[in-house]
């Protein structure tokens, strides 16, 4: 089944960062440099600097570092020794920079922070993917660096999910609670909000969060009825929130009995742990989503060594 959760195509345009991605890169770079206030250091000597991996991992962040160097170290040249998404070994050189010492030292810490953290996310994601038993993995909008986190998950082999709030429609528990009027209950709100969805705009990627088996069946029924009325046949993403693999299996079985499974992409989410991925793989869902691939992960340990004058 083709999943709408891979939005990475929106981040690249003809081999370069898209406008969306470029703006995000610039905002993070400028913020980090503004926070890293420092006196001028180094000299005008021409030096060669090497970025060396102190442990193995998956490299991510070339678009970001290229932008940092091009804009804030314009007199420097650079040469990547490791490609984006490539596995680097311990003590292996990642990048070589040649130029004025003061320019390199001014951005050194920000550069290492960016490359280290993004590579840490891509490395962690790749570890999750290797243990996934072929079930697809997506991150969530619980990010620390927004779109940069999403890119790193993509480089590690995961799915980006929604890049930002307006990237796709998502109806959550609080949306339903806010829509309940006098005399109505949660189920009434679910039916009402799904019935009001603009299919012309949102049919290809809509996510509906459900808390239990009954809500999942109700959401699937309401969606299928709306699709038939509109003479369309797109699937809705049912996000099974904190339901666990056992209840997810029941949802799959019940939807199949009611001939509703074909209308749904089932996403397991909430409390996902790497040591129970195998249980999710056999649950019948189409993917699982977790913030564990990008939040609180260990950055890849990278150092910068200046060799001295050329």
Regions of interest found by a model, annotated:
Residues 274:
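Short glycine/proline-centered loop/turn elements that form peptide/ligand docking sites
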Residues 258:
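Conserved phosphotransfer cores of two-component systems
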Residues 303-310:
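Active-site loop ensemble at the mouth of alpha/beta enzyme cores that anchors a bound cofactor
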Residues 1-237, 246-250, 265-268, 278-279, ...:
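Acidic/glycine-rich phosphate/pyrophosphate-binding loops and surrounding catalytic core
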Residues 242, 270, 292:
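Short secondary-structure boundary segments
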């Amino acid at each position: 089944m083709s999943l709408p959760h891979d939005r990475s195509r929106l981040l690249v345009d003809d081999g370069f960062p898209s406008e969306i991605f470029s703006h995000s890169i610039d905002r993070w770079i400028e913020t980090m440099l503004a926070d890293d206030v420092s006196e001028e250091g180094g000299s005008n000597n021409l030096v060669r600097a090497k970025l060396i991996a102190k442990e193995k991992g998956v490299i991510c962040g070339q678009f970001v570092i290229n932008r940092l160097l091009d804009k804030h170290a314009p007199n420097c040249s650079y040469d990547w020794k490791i490609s984006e998404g490539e596995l680097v070994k311990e003590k292996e050189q990642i990048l070589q920079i040649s130029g004025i010492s003061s320019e390199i030292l001014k951005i050194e810490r920000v550069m290492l922070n960016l490359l280290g953290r993004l590579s840490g996310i891509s490395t962690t994601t790749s570890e999750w993917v290797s243990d996934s038993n072929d079930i697809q993995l997506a991150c969530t909008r619980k990010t620390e660096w927004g779109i940069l986190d999403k890119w790193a998950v993509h480089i590690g082999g995961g799915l980006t999910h929604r890049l930002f709030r307006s990237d796709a429609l998502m109806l959550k528990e609080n949306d339903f609670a806010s829509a309940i009027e006098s005399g109505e209950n949660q189920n009434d709100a679910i039916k009402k909000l799904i019935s009001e969805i603009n299919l012309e705009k949102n049919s290809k990627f809509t996510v509906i969060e459900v808390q239990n088996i009954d809500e999942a069946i109700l959401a699937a029924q309401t969606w299928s009825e709306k699709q038939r009325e509109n003479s369309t046949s797109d699937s809705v993403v049912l996000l099974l929130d904190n339901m666990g693999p056992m209840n997810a299996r029941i949802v799959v079985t019940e939807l199949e009995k009611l001939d509703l499974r074909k209308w749904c992409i089932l996403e397991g989410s909430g409390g996902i742990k790497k040591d129970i991925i195998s249980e999710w793989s056999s649950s019948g869902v189409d993917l699982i989503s977790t913030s564990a691939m990008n939040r609180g992960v260990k950055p890849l340990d990278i150092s910068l060594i200046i060799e001295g004058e050329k």
